Amino acid sequence: MSYPASPSRYQDMEYRRCGRSGLKLPAVSLGLWHNFGDATLYDNARGLIRCAFDRGITHFDLANNYGPPPGAAEENFGRILNADLRAWRDELIVSSKAGYTMWPGPYGDWGSKKYLVASLDQSLKRMGLEYVDIFYHHRPDPDTALEETMAALDLLVRQGKALYVGLSNYPAERARQAFDILQRLGTPCVIHQPKYSMLERGPETALLDTLEEHGVGSIAFSPLAGGLLTDRYLHGIPQDSRAASGSRFLQPEQLTAERLDKVRRLDALARQRGQKLSQMALAWVLRGDRVTSVLIGASKNAQIEDAVGMLANRHFSEEELAQIETILL
């Protein structure tokens, strides 16, 4: 039986323009960094994708190395797309990235034209697609000229393998240089993907200003600080949690008494607002208009429902914003 997409899927979602481009992204996007590799039950991953699309999440964010093993998330997404969403391809924004190690030898990572072109070809094959909507360079390459890396992105757009290009993890000055090169080539950068949350505010120093000046949108990854900005750690470290398992994404030493106190105070404010801490944390990242979308991960449908439900209460009073600043000092 074919998947019957919800006819009301666009009802509760907000779509925000990506910088000065014509592209709009949902305020909440789904990242396939975790929970979509071969270690995950395929039926659960399929259910998450369906749930997301039914709630108006049209943007699915991948990378060549997402798994495990590397490539598995793209393969599984391709299977789900072919089984359920092929009829709605024109309603989807599919993004992928390349920059981290993908195969052995001198051509399997970083930012050479050789690597980026081969990587996207492989990603398209894994997903069964003719093109991706957004293709990112995943991290700056210290050894390859920025002109070569940006020329590779431009080439992939001209070849019809990507509609738009973006950058991830680039610091402000390096991003500015890349934007200028891409503009000269005629393929402007439309989006930047930084790590940004209440507990990771580095982009506020210079990056968000740079994006605004160049008309580039942004999509924040890890907006919940690896799960710390949820109710998961309010009373310590659960045995089945990411921190307890020794995950490199959330180490026990990150859960200091001072940081946990901040999280508890933020949770109290969220409850005053009538929402969960995770919802308030996502809404805070989306405050104003400098962040286009928040990139969530999910292992359960309820997490997607909560994230989309945040949109019904995403605005803050000046007093609430001041309270948050006081807590985060």
Which ranges hold each PLM region?
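Alpha-helix N-cap and loop-to-helix initiation/capping positions
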Residues: 40-44, 72, 76, 107-118, ...
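Hydrophobic faces of well-ordered beta-strands that scaffold small-molecule active sites
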Residues: 26-30, 60-62, 92-96, 135-137, ...
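Short, acidic/polar
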Residues: 39-52, 111-127, 175-179
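N-terminal small/glycine-rich loop or linker at the start of catalytic domains
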Residues: 19-37, 95-108, 131, 136
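Beta/alpha (TIM)-barrel catalytic core signal, keyed to glycine-rich beta->alpha loops juxtaposed to Asp/Glu
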Residues: 2-12, 142-329
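Acidic-and-aromatic substrate-binding clefts and catalytic sites of carbohydrate-active enzymes
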Residues: 36-41, 65-73, 141-145, 172-173, ...
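N-terminal binding-site loop/beta-alpha segment at the start of enzyme catalytic domains
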Residues: 1-92
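Active-site groove signature of glycoside hydrolases
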Residues: 124-144
